[in-house]
A protein has these predicted regions:
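C-terminal motif of bacterial Sec signal peptides marking the signal peptidase cleavage site
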Residues: 15-18
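Positively charged n-region of N-terminal signal peptides that target proteins for export
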Residues: 1-5
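Beta-propeller blade termini
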Residues: 99-108, 157-179
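Bacterial signal peptide processing site
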Residues: 20-22
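Acidic, small-residue rich beta-repeat scaffolds with periodic aromatic anchors
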Residues: 25-26, 43-44, 48-68, 170-295
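Beta-propeller blade repeat segments, especially FG-GAP/WD-type strand-to-loop junctions
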Residues: 127-144, 202-204
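Terminal domain-start segments
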Residues: 27, 35-36, 40-106, 290-295
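Acidic/hydrophobic-patterned starts of short beta strands in beta-sheet-rich repeat architectures
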Residues: 110-120, 174-183
């Protein structure tokens, strides 16, 4: 009997020792991986995936991960409430380029934090201007910086005849960070006989709305027959054909191995929300956010 007990204790000790060794090996492996990641983060993230579309099947986990590192702890509805309660800061009177004055909501950079876009356009030069807002980690309204040049026309984000607009988007991952590049256009009238039509992309980079200028079209009307002279070039000054101009954005981001998407926006007149109650303002903001889609 005593021998059996001793034998049993020996077996138990071997089992426990094996478990301890497994835990030790697992811990060492974990430490090794951590060291590898901390020592070569850029290399790992660059080769892990180059397209956001490659992450299909783990998208929910990825979004949750982005939320965790961005500090996006406030849910969408609470963010909308902050926009509604602070509309005196963004739904203000304007005295120029006011033929259209609208707002919409979207998660432009897919980080769980909603952006409020307030845009207005008009005037003889067809100028457009847009302000971008978000709710910061403290629950306060924050206007985002942009790379737009002061006093110059900005991209036309609204449709000139509809409250709906569709935008092509190219997404890619650089050093482990997702970038969403929205292809936008801007029509400007430089003189009674000359127009400029340019294409660029917008992306939010570290809370800055960043414009990448891509290509430009010049139209000049001269002579008794008002005949058009049209030319195209990229922003490096390289001459383009008409076909190259219209395909320029796609070719530019295809060279970066970016994935193609489409975003849909719904816009509402700012005048509709100025004198609305908080409840009605929340309803309107929620409506435009629910109409937003990204595929």
């Amino acid at each position: 009997m005593k021998k059996n007990i001793i034998f049993g204790l020996i077996i138990v000790s071997f089992v426990l020792a094996g478990c301890k060794q497994d835990v030790k090996e697992e811990k060492e492996a974990s430490t090794e991986v951590t060291k590898e990641l901390s020592g070569g983060q850029e290399e790992v993230t660059e080769t892990a995936t180059e397209k956001l579309s490659d992450m299909e099947g783990v998208w929910t986990d990825y979004v949750e991960y982005l939320d965790s590192i961005s500090g996006a702890t406030m849910d969408i509805q609470k963010q909308i409430e902050v926009f509604a309660q602070n509309r005196d800061k963004w739904a203000t009177d304007i005295d120029f380029a006011d033929e259209q004055y609208k707002f919409t909501l979207a998660d432009l950079d897919m980080d769980g934090q909603v952006e409020l876009l307030v845009s207005h356009s008009g005037g003889t030069g067809f100028f457009s201007y847009t302000s971008f807002y978000k709710v910061d980690k403290d629950g306060k309204l924050k206007e985002l910086d942009t790379t737009f040049s002061e006093y110059e026309s900005q991209p036309d984000l609204m449709d000139s005849v509809s409250d709906e607009s569709d935008v092509m988007v190219y997404s890619n991952i650089i050093n482990g960070k997702g970038y969403y590049n929205y292809i936008v256009y801007d029509l400007m009238k430089e003189s009674p006989s000359s127009y400029v039509y340019r294409v660029s992309s917008l992306a939010i980079v570290d809370d800055v709305v960043t414009e990448t200028k891509l290509a430009i079209e010049y139209e000049t009307y001269e002579g008794p027959d008002y005949e058009a002279t049209i030319s195209y070039e990229d922003y490096n000054g390289t001459e383009l054909t008409e076909e190259e101009y219209y395909a320029y954005a796609a070719a530019y981001y295809d060279a970066q191995n970016a994935a193609e998407h489409q975003a849909h926006f719904q816009w509402k007149d700012v005048s509709d929300i100025v004198n609305a109650s908080d409840e009605e303002a929340i309803r309107m903001l929620t409506e435009v956010y629910n109409a937003y889609s990204f595929n």
